[in-house]
Amino acid sequence: MTLARCPALCLLFVFLTSGAATATDLVNPLVTQRADPQVTLHTDGYYYLAATVPEYDRIELRRARSLNDLGKADAKAVWRKHAAGPMSANIWAPELHRIGDKWYLYFTAGRADAVFDVRLYVLENAAANPLEGSWVERGQLKTGWESFALDATTFALSGQRYLAWAQRPPGGSRHMTAVYIAKMDTPLSIAGPATLLTKPEYPWETVKYDVNEAPAVLVKNGRVFMTYSASATDANYAMGMLVAKDTADLLDAAAWTKSPAPVMASSAASGQYGPGHNSFTTSPDGKTDILVYHARNYRDIAGDPLRNPDRHTRAQPISWRADGMPDFGQPVPDGPTGTPRH
């Protein structure tokens, strides 16, 4: 039977037998009331979730053999805020990373007497299982200047480890953050000065607040994709993206190309609003790339969006275009979804 005689049937067969189409169906939301989600698939076969809890008072971890099981997995509080001083308020955006033979948690924290005077901090654990052992405070991760700093992530490329994070630029306004990158010389410190990669400039990045924050990195197809989130944390929140060649000097701002439009934004059609603060993981076999992010399933919020608990952890497969660029599409509706959407 030739393709000309059965185009629809044959194309359907190709689609259903592709790696993306056979990815395990995901059911959204994965976990309710968990914002800023970061999921890592470790070599032990477990997915680990670190995310912001609505109380902003602790760091929780949970693990499961599948993404869908994270919602019913036991959550363990591995660290709690201090009563006063540094690390005593606004515990935000924890990220779990295995570096060498230890686990590290990078997180944001303020002070009880100045809750929005946030900085970056690090915890360390030598146990094989990060839900066990002892998490040791390793102090503030210094960025080179003191100002509002949050949302640290780390990645390695060609033997070099990098830190990316958001911070108010020197001389920047109170409600402005930009995304920076620097090389790391240890898991606890950066080496040399930081490079500013993106600051708010487009209208969709400056709704209510001038915000670029929450960088996340995916290396694929000879490129480094760095997503980030922009604007206020309500329905205006949206994802942007920077792209560089994986052979480029990542500390050269000119090596990066910035998308002029959001790569994911609110969708009335799917009923999901304010998607962002994402991370990346894969299917268990590593064949399907998966976007993990938070969103609300309603648009209008009463009061301060930061006090609203309903940013839910969600996930969906990533589609890849013929030119090697990711197509995140729109946030999918609540319920099951498995195939990448365009």
Identify what each model region corresponds to.
Residues 6, 22-342:
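Carbohydrate-active catalytic/glycan-binding domains of CAZyme proteins
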Residues 7-18:
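Bacterial N-terminal signal peptides
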